[in-house]
Amino acid sequence: MNNKKTATNRKGMIPNRLNKFSIRKYSVGTASILVGTTLIFGLSGHEAKAAEHTNGELNQSKNETTAPSENKTTKKVDSRQLKDNTQTATADQPKVTMSDSATVKETSSNMQSPQNATANQSTTKTSNVTTNDKSSTTYSNETDKSNLTQAKDVSTTPKTTTIKPRTLNRMAVNTVAAPQQGTNVNDKVHFSNIDIAIDKGHVNQTTGKTEFWATSSDVLKLKANYTIDDSVKEGDTFTFKYGQYFRPGSVRLPSQTQNLYNAQGNIIAKGIYDSTTNTTTYTFTNYVDQYTNVRGSFEQVAFAKRKNATTDKTAYKMEVTLGNDTYSEEIIVDYGNKKAQPLISSTNYINNEDLSRNMTAYVNQPKNTYTKQTFVTNLTGYKFNPNAKNFKIYEVTDQNQFVDSFTPDTSKLKDVTDQFDVIYSNDNKTATVDLMKGQTSSNKQYIIQQVAYPDNSSTDNGKIDYTLDTDKTKYSWSNSYSNVNGSSTANGDQKKYNLGDYVWEDTNKDGKQDANEKGIKGVYVILKDSNGKELDRTTTDENGKYQFTGLSNGTYSVEFSTPAGYTPTTANVGTDDAVDSDGLTTTGVIKDADNMTLDSGFYKTPKYSLGDYVWYDSNKDGKQDSTEKGIKGVKVTLQNEKGEVIGTTETDENGKYRFDNLDSGKYKVIFEKPAGLTQTGTNTTEDDKDADGGEVDVTITDHDDFTLDNGYYEEETSDSDSDSDSDSDSDSDSDSDSDSDSDSDSDSDSDSDSDSDSDSDSDSDSNSDSDSDSDSDSDSDSDSDSDSDSDSDSDSDSDSDSDSDSDSDSDSDSDSDSDSDSDSDSDSDSDSDSDSDSDSDSDSDSDSDSDSDSDSDSDSDSDSDSDSDSDSDSDNDSDSDSDSDSDAGKHTPAKPMSTVKDQHKTAKALPETGSENNNSNNGTLFGGLFAALGSLLLFGRRKKQNK
C-alpha cells in the first residue's frame, strides 16, 4: 500500500531479508553565528557633528602690528603598548564613534587653536555646524570640534565583534516599575589594546611634538578591544571612569545617556554618565542573554576637561579605567588664547539637551584704556532668552582670571551685570551693552558669558557675531555653524512621552485579552525608530508589562520576541485596539500623549506524541493479528527534519514505544532490527495494522500519530532430517518328528517314508524419499531403518508303533505343511520447503513381526502278530514369505524328523498264518490305519491353522 498515510507523510521500506538497518547519527554542535560588530557609544537619539569657525578682524585707523603667529603642535605620548588579541570578523565594520561631534573654528590672522565640542540632542536643530567670526583684521583661526555623529566611518581598519547565539534561553526580568538591579561585573568585562589618540593633531614646529589643539578641529579618540564573559546577564553593570583631565564628548558635553551598540545598531548596554564623578555606568540589556562569546572593539570621542586642564602648552595625564583595566597617556593641550587681543570669544560648551551655545568672550585682555566701548552681539539662527537671565558681565580683577580654556572660575569674578543695561532688539537676536556706562575713560577688563538658543524659524546654519566698537578701532569676532550631517530638529523643551503596554498568555487562543488571562514574564521587546534604527530594548516584568520612556512625538516600531514554548496568537482581532494582539511587530505613533496600546499575545505551543508498536509477525503476513505479541527492547530513534537525533527509546514489554513533547513538523522514525529477526512485509493493510518498515518519514500537523508500527519474524534455518528404520527379520522353523515303531513276529514289512519340505521366502524393500528445499541454511539428513521380523515354527511329530507277530503291514504317512507369509511395507516421505532456517525432522520406524507355528503330531500304534504291514510316511512342508519395504532378514530353520523303526526287516520267515491269528491281525491292521488317518487329520488341521 503506497502513500497511505492520511495525516502523515511517510516513506516505507522495500522488504529484503538481507537488509541491514542502521541509525543515522547527526552531530550537533552548537551552531555558531559570526556577527561583525563595532560598538557605538552614543549619547542620544539624534546626534550631530558641529564645526565652529570663528574669525576675528580688527579695523585700525592707525598702523598696528598684528600678533605674531604661534605655531602650536601636539605630539601624542604613548605610556604603554598593549598586545592586540581581538579577533576580527570576515568583513570590515565601521568603528564606533561618539554620537555627537561639533567643530568650532575660530580664526584670526596669526594663529590657530582648536576647540572641539560633542553635542547630543534629538530635538534641537544642529548637526555639524561651522561658525565663522569675522572682523576687519584677522587675529586668530580657531576650530572647536567634537564628534556629534551617531556613527562615523573611520579610515582605520575597523575592529569587529564576533558573536554566536546562546544555546540556553535565559529570560531575565526588567520590570517597568523597578528595573532589575544586577551585579557589577567589571571583572568579567576585559579590555585590551587601550589607547588615547589625537585625531588630526598639530605638530609644534619648535618642539616637534604633536599637540592637542582643542579649538582647531582636534578631538581625542579613546580606543579599546573587549570581551564579555558568558556568565554576564541582563542587568549586570560595568563602568568607565575618566581621570581628572579627561572626559567623554567634545565641545558638546556628554549626554547623560551613553548607550553601547553593535555594528547593526542593537543595544548591548545602556550607559548613564555622571558628570559629578566623571563616570559612565553601563547596564547590560538582554542582548547578553541571547548571545555568547561576545567580543569586539570600540572607539569613543573624548575631550580635555576644561575646568581642570586650563593652561596652554601644558602636558596633562589623560587617564581612564575601563572595567578593571587602567590606561593613561600624557597629552599637550592648547586652547589658543591670545592674550594681546582686545576681543576674543570661544564656545565654552554646547549643551547636550537643547544644543544651546554657551559662549565666553574676553574683553580688553591687553588692558587698554578706552573712552568708548560698545559690545554688540548679533545672532543668526539663534535667539537670546531675556527671561533666562543668563547674560552675565564679570569684571576681571586679576589678570590670571583669563584662563586659556575659556572656563573661568566665576566665583572669583566680580559680577557687574546689574551695572549695565543689556538692550535686546531684532526679535531678541541682537544684544547691545555700553561698557563705559557714563565713564569718560576706562581700562577695565571684562569676561562676558551668554547663551544662544537655536531658532527653528531660521533657514540657515546659524552664526554668532561679536563687535567691540572703541574709540581706537572696531574689533570683530564671528562664530558660524554649518551642518556636516543632518539631524532632526526640535525645541529643547519638547515634552517626552511613554510607549508600551502588555504581553499576555492567550489561553483560549481567541486573540483577545480576557480578565482571567495573565501576563508573560521575560519577553524581549525592542524599540526602533521609523528608519529601523534600534533605540532601546527591555524585558517584560513578572506581570507581562513593559514600557519605553522619554520619547518624542513620532512613529516607532516595537518588536516582540516569541518566548520559548509559545506561539503568537491571532493578531488584530476585533475593533478594540486596547485588548487585541498587535502581533510580533507593530507600529506605534506618539502624538502629544502616551501610547500604551501596543500588546502582543501568545499561547502555549501544543505538544504532540508519536509512536505505537513493534510486534512478532509469526505468520509473516505483514499484519498485526490478535494472537501476535509485541517485541520488547527494540531500539527506536527519532530524528528531526535536519537529521538530528532528538530522541531514543526502547519498546516496553508489550512492544509499545512513544515520543512526547513534539512540535508540528517533519520527523523520521528508525527501528533497529533485533538480532535474529527478519523485517516483515510493509504497507500490506490498514495503516494502524501494517508494518511501516525500518525507516519511516512522518509529518505531524496538529495531531498525535500512533500508527508507526513495524513487524519482524524469526529467521529460520532449514534442517530436514528424515529417519526411516526398517528391520525385517524372518525366522521360519519347521520341525517334523515322525516315529514309527513296528513289531512283527513274522512277515512284517515296514516302510517308512519321511518327506520334509521347508520353503522360506523373505523380500525386504525399503523406499525412503526425502525432499528438502531450503533457500538458506538447509541441512537435510535422511535415515531409513526398516525392521521386519518373521518367525515361522512348524513342528510335526509322528509316532507309529506297530507290533505284529506275523504278516503285519503297518503304513504310517505323516504330512506336515507349514506356510508363513510376512509382508512389511514401510514408506517414509519427508518434504520440507523452507525459505530460511527451517528445521524439519521426520522419523519413520516400521516393525513387522511375523510368527508362524506349525505343529503336527502323528501317533500310530500297530500290533499285529502276523501279516502286518506298517508304512509311515511323514511329509513336513514349511513355507515362510516375508516382504518388507525396508530391510528384510530371514531365518528359516527346518528340522524334519521322520523315524521309522522296522523291527521285522531282519525276519527270515513270513508271519505265521492261521485261523487263530486272523482276527488279531485284522484288528491290528485296522487300528493302525485309523491311527494313521487320525494323525493325518490332526496334522492337516494344524497346518490350516498356521496358514
UniProtKB/Swiss-Prot annotation:
Keywords: Calcium, Cell wall, Peptidoglycan-anchor, Repeat, Secreted, Signal. This is Serine-aspartate repeat-containing protein C. Its main location: secreted. Gene3D superfamilies: 2.60.40.1280, 2.60.40.1290, Immunoglobulins (2.60.40.10). A motif (LPXTG sorting signal) lies at residues 910-914. Homodimerizes; via N2-Domain. Interacts with host NRXN1; this interaction mediates bacterial attachment to host cells. The gene is sdrC. GO terms for biological process: cell adhesion. Residues 685-695, 712-886 have a biased composition (Acidic residues). It comes from the Bacteria. InterPro entries: Adhesin_Fg-bd_dom_2 (IPR011266), Adhesion_dom_sf (IPR008966), Fibrogen-bd_dom1 (IPR011252), Ig-like_fold (IPR013783), LPXTG_anchor (IPR019931), SDr-like (IPR050972), Sdr_B (IPR033764), SDR_Ig (IPR041171). Residues 1-50 form the signal peptide. Disulfide bonds: none annotated. It comes from Staphylococcus aureus (strain Newman). Residues 72-83 have a biased composition (Basic and acidic residues). One of its GO terms (cellular component) is extracellular region. It is a peptidoglycan-anchor. PANTHER family: TOL-PAL SYSTEM PROTEIN TOLA. The keyword Secreted applies.
